[in-house]
Amino acid sequence: MSWRSAFLLQARSDNATREAINAQRVEYCHQLHYLQMSSEKLAKGFLTPESSSEPPDLTHAAFVRCLQVMKGRPEIRRLLKFSDAKVFAHYIDSLLPFAEQVQRLAPSFAKEKGPNPEYPWRLTVADPVTAPVEFDFPQFDSRNAQMIKLLDLLRDLLQIVS
């Protein structure tokens, strides 16, 4: 199996886990954790050439770059059922700020300074420590139009990218 195929396979599994967790109403931090991981692995798989003998870089900053690359790929645009390149570019551009927020859910971005779905944090030494299971992550509300749009795109990309 190639690095590309392995990352795409794992991305699909991570997303299926996110969907299963969502159906069981487990704490939202776990859904967000799997969202961040599946989007990162999709990006790494997509950006890694099939012939690569080296794994992708060990970075969490891959999803936004992946979307930017996809924006210029006519075959991806067509598979996502967009006939107009400008409309597709606008669609992707409209998601980039939110995709950046999802990408920044990785604890390495948040460090001890802010909310992430994996590790407890506190903003200042005077603040209490917060566990992710007790935080509601309001910017990622599942009813948020950007969240819905991003989840739809992720689902579609996981189906079409090989």
Where are these regions (language model features)?
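Long, charged low-complexity segments
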Residues: 1, 47, 51-162
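Charged alpha-helical initiation segments
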Residues: 1-37, 45-59
